[in-house]
Amino acid sequence: MELLKALLLLSGVLGALAEFCVIPKMDGQLVEKLGQRLLPWMDRLSSEQLNPSIYVGLRLSSMQAGTKENLYLHNLKLHYQQCLLRSTSSDDNSGCQTKISGGSLALYLLALRANCELLGSRKGDRMVSQLKWFLEDEKKAIGHHHEGHPHTSYYQYGLSILALCVHRKRVHDSVVGKLLYAVEHDYFTYQGHLSVDTEAMAGLAFTCLERFNFNSDLRPRITTAIETVREKILKAQAPEGYFGNIYSTPLALQMLMTSPGVGLGPACLKARKSLLLSLQDGAFQNPMMISQLLPVLNHKTYLNLISPDCQAPRVMLVPATEDPVHLSEVSVTLKVSSVLPPYERTVSVFAGASLEDVLNRARDLGEFTYGTQASLSGPYLTSVLGKEAGDREYWQLLRVPDTPLLQGIADYKPKNGETIELRLVKM
């Protein structure tokens, strides 16, 4: 009896200590500038550049793009439905210039839910089946004893479970079990660093399953995993306030905002401060990162797509006025040590040029080649000087001597005198 009283007292104390993660309102002009950066991307309607995350981010934000949103969703539907239905009916996929990945399809399902659409038609059922096939294929790649890895990533795996869940579609216990095992055994730590966005996506997926009481036989493990994810994210907070890095912070905050916990209040206020400084410095330029941050600034998460409010008032965005361009040159040195003979060359580009511009300039000068592949987060390197990234390898971008870049080649803008190394590393 005394033990029971002690446990009840302890649970009461912990309950009293639990806090919500609240992000106080930020300067409206900063938030508006963030939304304005998405507008040019909504004019890019080619199959390679369509990004469902842009639509989701805007719909969960406090801003809207008017008829542009409707046109963008229309083009998303044309692209995904035509490509997916063609790929399931035959091997002829010639009408689609890019292959639809599981993560991309999952984001498209989130976009439909952001428009208050629930999958129920024959086309919708085929898309659900396609995403479930993707998860089954990834489950097989992971292996019965978890000795393997997903063909894509655990991030896409968790995102796919989340997308099906917000559409009220169940997945098999064995599929959820793989993600649970990965969280329980620290599979999202690479080279000593936690992949915060992967951890957060898994946490969002588990929280959705818990709210619907899906996979009830796994309920105790799901509840424990949610707590584990929260604790890992909080431990990954840097002294500056961000979780992991500044670009993984939006998803981390989405996860932390879903339920109360001990110590969340101060941690989230600290994260807000780091985000504010980054926004003032213009750090968020990539549409994928912006679209993950906008919901947070509107006190929403992907879990709001369970019951979206499509009638909520949103402020109309207007295009930003362009600042005058002052042309000056900077010198950037490119270094590649992962090939023989090693490569090193200094090139000149206009100030404000991206790393991709630097690579193009080096290629134009001769003796340098590289290949890329498009993704929703922007192009990434697949080969440098003829050397292809192999299985479980990737080309890492570093600022010499040894600082990994947090942005991709299309987003990072080297400063004058910097040396950028392209290094082939194993995952």
UniProtKB/Swiss-Prot annotation:
Q: Which positions does UniProt annotate for cob(II)alamin binding?
A: 152-156, 193-197, 245, 248, 292, 395-397
- Supply the source organism for this entry: Rattus norvegicus (Rat)
Q: Which InterPro entries did the record assign?
A: Cbl-bd_prot (IPR002157), Cobalamin_Transport (IPR051588), Transcobalamin-like_C (IPR027954)
Q: Which UniProt keywords apply?
A: Cobalt, Cobalt transport, Disulfide bond, Ion transport, Metal-binding, Secreted, Signal, Transport
- A GO term, aspect molecular function: metal ion binding
GO annotation, biological process: cobalamin transport; cobalt ion transport
The family classification in the record reads:
Belongs to the eukaryotic cobalamin transport proteins family.
Per UniProt, subunit arrangement is:
Interacts with CD320 (via LDL-receptor class A domains).
Give the PANTHER family listed for this entry. TRANSCOBALAMIN-1/GASTRIC INTRINSIC FACTOR, TRANSCOBALAMIN-2
Q: Does the keyword Iron apply?
A: no
Its Gene Ontology cellular component terms are: external side of plasma membrane; extracellular space
Q: Which residues cross the membrane?
A: none
Q: State the taxonomy lineage.
A: Eukaryota, Metazoa, Chordata, Craniata, Vertebrata
Please verify whether the record's keywords include Disulfide bond.
yes
Where does the protein end up?
Answer: Secreted
Instruction: Note the SS bond partners.
Output: 21-268, 116-310, 165-208
- Signal peptide (from-to): 1-18
Q: Which gene encodes it?
A: Tcn2
**Tell me, what does this protein do in biology?**
Primary vitamin B12-binding and transport protein. Delivers cobalamin to cells.
One Pfam family, short name please? Cobalamin_bind
Name of the protein: Transcobalamin-2
